């Protein structure tokens, strides 16, 4: 079955369904690597991507953003000059009740009888202003980190913004952007 458009699954309109033991065949997470680059490095700045609205982000979008970030930063900055961390985990199991369509569909389709649905993927549930991912870099690579964040935000089905923090965790976005 084809992958549905992300706009179907992005809204957080129902409570999270946390009873995984009732869902037969729940898929495993596609994203397995949450830290890349140089985690032991000492970096001056931390750039974080935040959501502007409550949203569900599918694991496919998280994996696409991860590969895009890794490719861009490795090529332009070098693997030892950055560290990024994905801060969300896809817990929510997405389900779909496949409806039969076409000729004689009423003969073999179930309609709304037993409509629990089959699992089709996983998603991460995010609140407003929650961090999605974080990149740590030094001053000379800050422009590349901001460009990488813009590229990663295009993979998500929501409006995103970034914040720049120093080592102590103070928000210095306006001060740094005025000097760039």
Swiss-Prot record:
Family annotation (CDD domains): Ribosomal_L16_L10e
GO cellular component terms given for this protein: ribonucleoprotein complex; ribosome
Molecular functions (GO terms): structural constituent of ribosome
GO biological process, one term: translation
Keywords: Ribonucleoprotein, Ribosomal protein
Family designation: Belongs to the universal ribosomal protein uL16 family.
Listed PANTHER family: 60S RIBOSOMAL PROTEIN L10
Designated name of the protein: Large ribosomal subunit protein uL16
Organism from which the protein derives: Thermococcus sibiricus (strain DSM 12597 / MM 739)
